[in-house]
Amino acid sequence: VQAALPAHPITTQYRETDWAFVTRLLAEAGLAWRYAHAQDADSQATAATLVIFDPQAQAPDSGTIRFHRSDLAEADDAIGAFGERRGVVPTTSTVTSWHSEQVRAVGAQAQAEAGALPPLEVYVQPRAGRFAQEATAQDQAQARLDALRVPHTLHAGAGSARVLAAGAAFTLRQHAQHDGQRFVPVAIEHVAVNNLGQGIVALLDAPELEHGSYRNRFLAVPAATPLRALPQDRPRMPGPQSARVVGVADAALSPSRDHQVRIQFPWQRGDQPTPGGLTDSASTAPGHAPGDQRAGTWVPVAEWVAG
């Protein structure tokens, strides 16, 4: 990852699995991920490493794969079917967020070539104060547009190429239309049949599979396509939430200019959690529960005299 990632005032995992929580944060940051599988030559153990990358990262190279039939008489693996499909996707992404300290809306817009189609815009307005400057908004607009445009050109293929790996680029040869072009698989389905004759071919309803053979099918995009994940909606907390107002020790409570105070939730762990809370079991870096002005985030205060 080469891009600088912003720090959030508070990040909460609520009613979502660890995997859903982590991938949601990665998608919000405009990042993608893949698994790198490795096996030690001296053992039967295998290892899978989660690799996180941005569009500037260079994809691993799976080499050259020819477009040819796949059968037992062939010495090399090949791709036996390879097609292309196009989809109508947005061409413009606009994000805007009101920034109370700057008394203005901070936003940006990213655009892509529309061709003969009319402009198709996606407009997103996140919470207030989401962007401190236009550069951050521009990064978010571009990341969302890149994620929305991944399905613009998809290639569906099938064959026996065992070197294919999601996120790793390959060069296609001997194809009438795509010879010499590079592609990156984004999804692969593997089917391997052993030679023990246990009727797996009949169970899979795939008579084209021979005993002791391997086949796959995959979806790929052109290698120049920026790979990003589309941000997903975060779970919502229904009803009110209790919290404690925090600030500078032994000092009067000082709200912000916009009548906001800083709060610390009881489920935040740290050195000084609220009564009933737990101490931090991992990092004690700022942002957990220090019990002072560094905790949590600013929230507006509603009073009965508010207009």
Task: Label each PLM-derived region with a short phrase.
Residues 1-307:
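Amphipathic alpha-helical and helix-coil boundary elements used as assembly
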